[in-house]
Each structure stands twice: as structure tokens, then as C-alpha cells.
Amino acid sequence: VTIAESHLMDLDALVKSRFIEMFGDPVEENRWARITLASLCTKLGSGATPRGGKAAYKTSGIPLIRSMNVHNGYFESKDLAYIDEIQAKKLDNVTLHKGDVLLNITGASVARSCLLPDYLAGGRVNQHVSIVRCDPNRMLPRVLNSIFTSDSYQRFLLEHSRMAGATREAITKDDLETMTVPLPPLSLQYKFAAFVAQVDKSRFVAQQQIEKLQMLYDSLAQEYFGD
């Protein structure tokens, strides 16, 4: 398992270094014009927890994404919550679309960001997760997510979350709207996206290896140490 997990970490590092090579540091870089997220995005906003909290969640239905699901560069589907149609109706303004970038905006996991998996389009987010929906004719979601998860932008987001003497980390909607990101040429963005798509194929294989080895370990452990 360790070798496969190490391979996954290497792939993440490869994508990060390729990003810096192509676009530079997203906080310091001045080759490209900078644009506010308010200008770039067609949607910036978080949702709410249904009345009744955890007890109100269902065993199936419409997915409700929480901060525990959002990790840097990947989505964790374990412990995914579900709500019913009536609860979802109240959160229609945060209906997820294919290509949305997710960003944790409060708590210990603040600043974590990933792309929404396509199969969760139509779901909702709670108050700890913001939808960041960029105009794909100006910036590809994959590029925006790579900006958010770069080391320097992570530091920038974390610093922002601790400003104004807040008792807990938080990035407000006003903060988000005024944040700027570099806007490289779309042709260069497509080249980067093609590179990441190739890396993702290797990532998928490595992930499958980890899961197979875990299943093998679990079955052996059950056989030798079980009842």
C-alpha cells in the first residue's frame, strides 16, 4: 500500500510543479492580468445545514456536500450525506453544476479545495463549503482548482481566514469576491488540463491498487485474526 500511496503523492507533486512551470506562482506572478473572483465567477456561495442537523440526513436522496468531503485535489465520498427533495428545495440557490470548484470556507479544514465529481451535479452544499463556478470561456475549473491548491495560494487563503481577529478560521463571501487570480491564455490552460488528464489516468490505476491491497489485507486479517 505504501508504494502505491507514495506514487499518488509523486503524481500530485508532478502536477504542482508542472503548474508552476507553466503559469508561475499564482500569488506573485505578474505575467498575466489578474482578475477578481467576482468578475471571473458566475456563482460564489455556500448553503446551509437542514433543520435538525445530522438527524435530518437521509440514507439516500440528494447529496449534501460537507467540508469533510472536500480535500485538496480530491473528493472524499465517504460519509457523504443525503437530503430529501423538500430539504433540497430550500437549498436550490446552491445546486451544484458539473465543473464546479468546491472550497471549504470555515473551520479546521478551511481553504481545502477540489473539483466536483461529475456524478454529484445536482447536489447541494452546506454552510461550510462554497461553490466557486468560474466562466469556462475565461478559466478552466481544473486550472482554478490548481491555483487554489498551490502551496502559495493555500498560505494566502489560510492567512485570509485568520484575519480580523476572528475566533475561528473563516473566509467570507466578501473575501472571496475580492480575491484575485492570474488569468493565463486559454490555450495554455488547455495544455495544462490535457497534462493533468494524463496524470489522472495513472492516479486512477494507483488508487485501484490501493483499494485492492486494502481488501486483500482486510480479508487476510479476518481469516487469521477473526472469530
How should these model regions be labeled?
Residues 119, 134-137:
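Short loop segments at secondary-structure junctions
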Residues 122-130, 139-142, 162-190:
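A short glycine-rich beta-alpha junction/loop motif
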Residues 71-82, 101-104, 108-126, 142-146, ...:
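Short, ligand-facing micro-motifs at secondary-structure edges
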Residues 30-73, 87-91:
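Low-complexity, Lys/Gly-biased intrinsically disordered segments
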Residues 2-48, 178, 182-191, 197-227:
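Non-catalytic DNA-recognition/assembly elements of restriction-modification systems
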